[in-house]
Amino acid sequence: MALTFPSIIEILGTLTFAISGIRLASAKRFDWFGAYVVGLITAIGGGTIRDLLLDTTAFWMLNSIYLTVTAVALLLVIIFGRYLIRLNNTFFIFDTIGLALFVVVGIQKTIAADFPFWIAIIMGTITGAAGGVLRDILINEVPLIFRKEIYAMACVFGGIVYWICYRLDYAPHLTQVLAALTVIATRIVAVKYKLSLPRLRGDEEVEESENSDREDSRQ
């Protein structure tokens, strides 16, 4: 693999996403092999789904560096695990960076395949978010993308910024950096100020609301 700017982004995204997956696996007391599998699925899951939808060979089947980078991520967690645990928001940091980088990778690869930009934004979102969905399923958690946090929408915002910069004919590197920073900034602002999308009300909440209305009417 030639070390171009997009390939560096992809490698860094693989490393950070793998660390986020392995970090959660360690919290669930997985063994080394299980942690490696979770880290690998986190790192390559979104890109694999993207490549299947784009009808191309999965990227990790063309180069073993992604398997190697995941092994490096496992080694880093094993060696520096105590420091990572002590560091506040370890998972959030690595997950957010990986999300931002993979959104850029997904958009860039889709554009290179001559798909329209709205498809590129969808593929960027899938590349960034789908690996995390698979990770959460493997560790028996509700996927982060389906909780209140703004996650997938951060990918969409990053994609829109990418499109705007692309239309304004910005340099490719600047476009990719600005799109990634948009994803990171959106996630940070959403978490800091507890911003979230509206939730659908469940049956229990509806019943509680109806009971409350009845009590109010009696009074």
For each predicted feature, which ranges?
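The first (N-terminal) embedded transmembrane alpha-helix
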Residues: 8-20, 38-41
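Structural signature of hydrophobic alpha-helical transmembrane segments
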Residues: 2-14, 58-72, 116-128
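Cytoplasmic-side transmembrane-helix entry/capping segments in multi-pass membrane proteins
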Residues: 33-41, 63-68, 88-99, 121-123, ...
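Short, structured motif recognition centered on aromatic/hydrophobic residues
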Residues: 37-41, 48-54, 122, 126, ...
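Helix-coil boundary and interhelical linker segments in multi-pass alpha-helical membrane proteins
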Residues: 1-5, 51-61, 106-119, 164-175
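Ordered, amphipathic secondary-structure segments that act as subunit-interaction surfaces
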Residues: 72-109
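C-terminal ends of transmembrane helices
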Residues: 18-28, 51, 75-88, 133-143, ...
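Intrinsically disordered, low-complexity non-transmembrane regions of multi-pass membrane transporters
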Residues: 1, 195-219
